[in-house]
Amino acid sequence: MDRIKIVGGNKLNGVIPISGAKNAALPLMIASLLTDDTLTLENVPHLADVEQLIRILSNHGVDYSVNGRREHQNGPYSRTIHFTARNIVDTTAPYELVSRMRASFWVIGPLLARMGEANVSLPGGCAIGTRPVDLLLDALLALGAEIDIENGYAKAKARNGLVGARYKFPKVSVGATHVMLMAATLAKGETIIENAAREPEVANLADCLNAMGAKISGAGSSTIHVQGVTNLSGARVRIIPDRIEAGTYAMAVAMTGGDVLLEGAQESQLSCVLETLRQAGAEINETNSGLRVVRNGHGIQPVDITTDPFPGFPTDLQAQFMGLMTRAKGTSHITETIFENRFMHVQELARLGAKISLSGQTATVEGVERLKGAQVMATDLRASVSLVIAGLAAEGETIVNRVYHLDRGFERLEEKLSRCGADVKRISG
């Protein structure tokens, strides 16, 4: 099992190209199930979750081909993938595939909309709380689906097709918004989605669906209107830059000090995060090619945050920000409102010398003068990279174990960091 070895103390200087967003790539790939034409996606990141979803789509009969190239010498391996779901051969998504990644459950929406039925295993993924699928299933019920839960599977049918409806989510959910949006494109009549997720990835999906012939307006706001169409066609769509990856590297620079251009990053996707990092002592400016992040001799200042749906502070950057706050000159408070069990990294950060206490959904972080390297273990995707950030500033050697979590969401992380001066190596086996 691979590990990441970090020798801390080096500042980061250089350019880090930001890859395509995993959280946008996955729903756009699933949208290929809605048409028998070819959907071509550009800027697809090379990640374990993407490869797993390709296997799941192939199980349903989706053909695919990959074109890959480096956009420039030090850039990410940008991939264009062509998906063609001309013949859906199976509407069952089995446990052995779906259990490995939660987002794979989203195939239930397109399969139900196009084929009138879907039999999908209840999902797996990061162990950061129960993350129930009730919101998603209730949305499909509102569109006229019949759903039974039997033997760990959601069995859904729409005997006469889905029918548009007005539906308000009781709680904002990105995944449920994705699924309802995809299903509604082929429903009869108009669907109005209220309290919809506003994330940039939702807008990217809507742009993709519109390019395929859907009639969607309002994506990126809390109310989305969908006028159903009889069929969708192929399209060519580019996946947006990964704002979580960009925010992660911005925090790494704030942690170590230095001067890094995050190539392709967009301030509009990260305004809350960037303002928080400015309060913490980083200087951040938008350029024609991305975001430049600088931290010179000034120390890290403590900042309190509360995670919220977009445009608030994203839960997917909470662990990384906690890693940064372990070196702040004072005490900070981090409150998690999205998931009920997303503090599993606290114990591992403590192994590096962090002082963190928990009370309910709030972590109190007392900044320390120094961290010291140690063996630590990744518990989930975002927690794993918080340990990398802490290790970059720790004295001595840090070994991060179980880095398969990292490979689910960060494309060639050790390569990108080492090119900016970090002493980071992958140890195989």
Curated annotation (Swiss-Prot):
Superkingdom of origin: Bacteria
Q: Which CDD domains match?
A: UdpNAET
Q: Where, by residue number, does phosphoenolpyruvate bind? A: 22-23
What top-level class of enzyme does the UniProt entry assign? transferase
Keyword Cell wall biogenesis/degradation set for record: yes
Query: What is this protein's function?
Result: Cell wall formation. Adds enolpyruvyl to UDP-N-acetylglucosamine.
Q: What is its EC number?
A: 2.5.1.7
Gene3D superfamilies recorded: Enolpyruvate transferase domain
Protein name per Swiss-Prot or TrEMBL? UDP-N-acetylglucosamine 1-carboxyvinyltransferase
Per the Swiss-Prot or TrEMBL record, the active site comprises: 126 (proton donor)
- Subcellular location as annotated: Cytoplasm
Cross-referenced HAMAP family: MurA
Q: Which family does it belong to?
A: Belongs to the EPSP synthase family. MurA subfamily.
The record's Gene Ontology cellular component field reads: cytoplasm
- Recite the UniProt keywords alphabetically: Cell cycle, Cell division, Cell shape, Cell wall biogenesis/degradation, Cytoplasm, Peptidoglycan synthesis, Pyruvate, Transferase
Pathway connected to this protein: Cell wall biogenesis; peptidoglycan biosynthesis
* GO BP terms in the entry: cell division; cell wall organization; peptidoglycan biosynthetic process; regulation of cell shape; UDP-N-acetylgalactosamine biosynthetic process
Q: State where it is primarily located.
A: cytoplasm
What PANTHER family does this protein map onto?
UDP-N-ACETYLGLUCOSAMINE 1-CARBOXYVINYLTRANSFERASE
- Where UDP-N-acetyl-alpha-D-glucosamine binds, per the record, is at 102, 131-135, 171-174, 316, 338
Name the reaction it catalyses: phosphoenolpyruvate + UDP-N-acetyl-alpha-D-glucosamine = UDP-N-acetyl-3-O-(1-carboxyvinyl)-alpha-D-glucosamine + phosphate
